[in-house]
Amino acid sequence: MLDIKWIRENPEALDAALAKRGAEPQAQSLVALDEKRRSAVQKAQDMLSRRNLASKEIGAAMAQKNGELAEKLKAEVAELKTLLPAIEEEDRQLTAELNDALSRIPNIPFDDVPVGKDEHDNVVTRTVGEKPRWNHTPKEHFEIGEALGYMDFERAAKLSGSRFTVLTGPLARLERALGQFMIDLHTREHGYTEVSSPLMVRAEALFGTGNLPKFEEDLFKTTDDRYLIPTAEVTLTNLVREEILEQEKLPLRFTALTPSFRSEAGSAGRDTRGMLRQHQFWKCELVSITDADSAIAEHERMTACAEEVLKRLGLHFRTMTLCTGDMGFGSRKTYDLEVWLPGQNAFREISSCSVCGDFQARRMNARYRGKDDKTNRFVHTLNGSGTAVGRCLIAVLENYLNEDGSVTIPDVLLPYMGGLTKIERAA
């Protein structure tokens, strides 16, 4: 959430930033609403001050045996007591209205973020590796998995409907191996602390990360008003909600391997075959909590940690800087990692790493105490996928496919596969 004080002082800057995102100007309406709220606050404060002063004057009038003045003051205090609740309620309503309006305003992009409308305006930052060179014809992951006999969409549909998958045997093990490899890499070599956290959260947690109220249609909600997490970013980031941290203990780096749940409400007709766009999928999440001075360097570091997963798997990928029109709601700058899928003859997103500034921290009231001046400031938050396990499985199947239809296990995963070096068709 943005700072209303900053908006009051920089209305043109807000509208210019929104224009870069393709959004309508909001500064005038926000400032007008804030002025109404501040007027109500001032009116309530003036009324309280007058009531308190009148109460003191009653005592003075009584001491001077001025009964007429005392009665007049008592009547004034009684009237103020009657009027005050309505003014305080107006203040509460205007504050809630302003906070709701602010909660729907996206974050301000950094100046170095390319301006653009959609994914076609994203910029290639770097490319790693090369496309595999084969004599055989590439296949899509669902063709490979079904031919091997370990990927079943029909039974998954019987169980749960569309956008679900059943994996069995060595493919189920490969999925587990990928997740274990990622979490081991990030905890053993990249300095992240592993966290096991709930898969269901309250609305307040999703508000903190910016998923609510704007994106409720993308979430699965339980009958007792909890939500299934769309990403472990929600739980990991909210670990510091309503806390004041010591600056010298920053950065905090958390990672978790969890299922993620998404309704894919806006994805009708997109990637309907296979595992690319699922209602339920495993993902290794990375979250950093830091201060303003360290956030940009931490963003580069986090992205490098995610890239290392793909490098060690020997996968060809590119890192994209997202344009203003394709960035997430809470992001100030985002890098997407896109892995090469031979079966699609295309790069597809496998990780997204974002720096959010203090946008989420304001929503969570998460702060740190400066080590020198002891002033409390909002933390800066970052999040990224390190990486999406299902999409990594897709990439391994398509890039390690052999001419006979078998799939070679990448060397880095062999310690997790119980001696299996190749996945072959089920007998």
UniProtKB/Swiss-Prot annotation:
Major localization class: cytoplasm
Entry EC number(s): 6.1.1.11
Q: Where does L-serine bind?
A: 231-233, 285, 385
Q: Give me the reactions it catalyses.
A: tRNA(Ser) + L-serine + ATP = L-seryl-tRNA(Ser) + AMP + diphosphate + H(+); tRNA(Sec) + L-serine + ATP = L-seryl-tRNA(Sec) + AMP + diphosphate + H(+)
One Pfam family here: Seryl_tRNA_N
- Keywords assigned by UniProt, alphabetized: Aminoacyl-tRNA synthetase, ATP-binding, Cytoplasm, Ligase, Nucleotide-binding, Protein biosynthesis
GO cellular component terms, semicolon-separated: cytoplasm
UniProt superkingdom: Bacteria
Q: Which SUPFAM superfamilies match?
A: Class II aaRS and biotin synthetases, tRNA-binding arm
| Family assignment from sequence similarity | Belongs to the class-II aminoacyl-tRNA synthetase family. Type-1 seryl-tRNA synthetase subfamily.
Complexes and interactors: Homodimer. The tRNA molecule binds across the dimer.
Q: What is this protein called?
A: Serine--tRNA ligase
